[in-house]
Every structure is written in C-alpha cells, then in structure tokens.
Amino acid sequence: MNLVGTFLVPPVNTSMRRLLPILILVLFSAPAALADDARAQQILKQARQAIGGEEQLQKIQGLQVKGQYRRAFGDRQMGGDREISILLPNKYLVEDAMNSGGLSTAMINTRGLNGDKAWSGNSGGGGMFIRMMGPGGQQASPEQMEEMQRRIFSAEFSRYLLAMILTPLPALAVEYKYAGESEVEDAQADVIDVSGPDNFSVRVFFDKQTHIPLLLSYRGPKPRIMTMQRPSRNGATPDDIRKAREEAEKRMSSENPPVPEEVDFFIRLTDHKKVDGLTLPHKLTFLTETEVSEEFEISKYQVNPQFKADLFEKH
C-alpha cells in the first residue's frame, strides 16, 4: 500500500524506543502450538468475561474511539489526533490528523472499509513528502490497489477488534488454537493463535490472573519508508506540489526495491479502564521487532454511537 502525505516531522522522542525490552526477550518462551481448541475457547471465554461479559459484548454494534498518536519514522517523529469509527459487521474508518509543526492546516490521512470496498485518501498541507511502499515497490493498478487495501485494512480492523473487544471481523471465519504460556513483562500469560482467510494470523496473550488481553503479535513485511523535503504549501503552488510528487514517484519507481523482510509486529495493551460496563485498553503501543513505531493514547470511547449515513463512503 502506498500512503502519500504532507507534513513536518519533528525530532523523535527517544523515550518511545525504550519500551518493553524484557517483553521481547521472553516473548517466545511459549511452547509450540498445541491444537487444543477447547483450551483456546476456555481462555477466550474467561477473557471476554473479564472485559465485560458476553451479554455486554453482544450489545456492541459500533464503536467510536478518539485519541492522540505519535509515530516514529527512523530518527523522526510525527503525531496528531486519531479517530476510529466502527460499525459492525463491516464498516471501518480511521482518520489521522497529522500535526504540521505550526502550519495553519494539517494533513488528514483517511483509510476505510465499506463492506467489501476499501479506500484511502489524504488532504491538507505541510512540509514533508513521505511515501510508504508496499512489498515489491511496484506501481499497482487501481484494482490491485483496492484489493491490497481491502486485505490490509481488514486485517488491521480485526486486530483493533481483538485488542479492544476480543471480537474479530464478523465476516472473517477464524480458528482459535491454544499456543501455550509465556510472559509479558512480569505477568504470566496464556497464549492463543487466531487464524483466518487471506493469511490472517495473530497471537493473543492474556494475563493468567486477570484474563485481560495484554499483547497481540503477528508477522508481516517490514515497511519501506522514503522521505523527501519539499516547499511548504505557503511557498508552493499546486503545480510545484504536483511536480514534487511526480519526481518522488519517478525516483522510487526507477529503484530496484529489495525483497521485503518478514518481521515481528507487536501491539501492547495497557491502561485498561471501565467504559459503559466494559474494561477497555486506553493505550496501544505498536512495535516493529524491538523498536516502538507508534503509541496511541485513547482519550474517549463511545459505544454504539450514531454515525452519519455517508460517513464510511469514500471522501
């Protein structure tokens, strides 16, 4: 997937990089997966009870999640406001307002699912051009791009649902298998594997004492990120911006992309609080191998909100 945006990126907050060194060392102490579906279902039942109970969870038809995120790009960091809108069974929207270092406008990056349709877009200003290349780095057709986005966004959607309410995307027929025991920092953890179509696979770690979900892990290609400076919108015409974008795309297309490296990704779930009878995580920390890539601090959940009729349509 290619994400093109415009924003200024301040120096990285190095404290983001010091999180969870113990976690990474002990994470793989779980034994090889045991095809014990009954044990996996028992762990899942205990966990769903711990975060609110089956009756409360069954009432959830939608969620709106608001907060602030910080994301690292090498030695740079950017951040802003994030709003996630979910309407079950198959509507999903993420809107990231990327703060632009004091400029009058911020770049709004949007990605969404509306049934089987996937889309993304961006708007606004800034002073940095960043493009994230998908595996292979080749230019995809519009049809290929939409299919790739559908797979990526569906997997992301399911990971958010599992992290928050232990419910995968309803249309995703998943299997649960017991994977053993491990440690997440100082907590003993039960571990289950969740797998489904389109190579969806995630490992979920639950506190053995409280049964609260602590961590998700999965594997995927390491993102390839390229950056270039360009004039800010205040000093550039639309033609200047178009030319800068075309030059960056031409340069990336002419390079031979490396074979994508498969790496481990982690989502650490902390700061659980009560919301309308549910116990929900209010901080999600995303790691690529041992490096913290993003922190998402949630300030507000709204259960079963009323959404505008056209919210999930491409805009």
Regions found by a protein language model. Give the residues of each.
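N-terminal mature ectodomain segment of secretory-pathway/periplasmic proteins
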Residues: 42-132, 172-180
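Positively charged n-region of N-terminal signal peptides that target proteins for export
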Residues: 1-4, 12-19
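Solvent-exposed loop/turn segments connecting transmembrane beta-strands
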Residues: 73-77, 102, 157, 198-201, ...
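Gly/Pro-enriched, hydrophobic low-complexity segments
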Residues: 181-315
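Bacterial N-terminal signal peptides
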Residues: 21-30
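Acidic/charged, solvent-exposed loop-and-adjacent secondary-structure segments enriched in E/D, K/R, S/T
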Residues: 117-160
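Sec/Tat signal peptide C-region and signal peptidase I cleavage site
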Residues: 31-35
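Short, conserved active-site entrance elements at the starts or edges of catalytic domains
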Residues: 152-193, 214
